[in-house]
Amino acid sequence: MALNLQDKKAIVAEVNEAASGALSAVVADSRGVTVGAMTSLRKQAREAGVYMRVVRNTLARRAVEGTQYECLQDTFTGPSLLAFSNEHPGAAARLFKDFAKENKNFEIKAAAFEGAVTDADVLATLPTYDEAIARLMMCMKEASAGKLVRTIAAVRDQKEEAEA
């Protein structure tokens, strides 16, 4: 079904709004994936706080203009499935990576984070906020209090020598 100009403008505005507030973006090709599998992917995306939409390439290019995801414009060839992570930068990449393991026809084209194209695998392995805090606490716990005090004292001594 052909879209009229108002529908196209609405789609561009909706995707642009999602892109403006997103932490990261992922573009994928979903040719050959069954409708049932795509429905389950959309459900998982909603649960993970990921905005996901199939958009025509020309509309996708216009939608990302003026956002940090302009770097993805070259990847809009063939059928494009756009996903924007709203809650965690790696959410969309992790979701697509897991989905691609189960569906061989699903292909991740590109991912972007902070205005640059990045590897989707790297983006997918970013720790969540809770995981990062747990890692930090584990590192702090491993260092004994004495080592920490000596390290802080050494830094203080270096700063005092630099001032003198």
UniProtKB/Swiss-Prot annotation:
GO terms for biological process: translation. InterPro entries: Ribosomal_uL10, Ribosomal_uL10-like_sf, Ribosomal_uL10_bac, Ribosomal_uL10_bac_type, Ribosomal_uL10_CS_bac. Signal peptide: none annotated. GO terms for cellular component: large ribosomal subunit. One of its GO terms (molecular function) is structural constituent of ribosome. Belongs to the universal ribosomal protein uL10 family. This is Large ribosomal subunit protein uL10. The gene is rplJ.
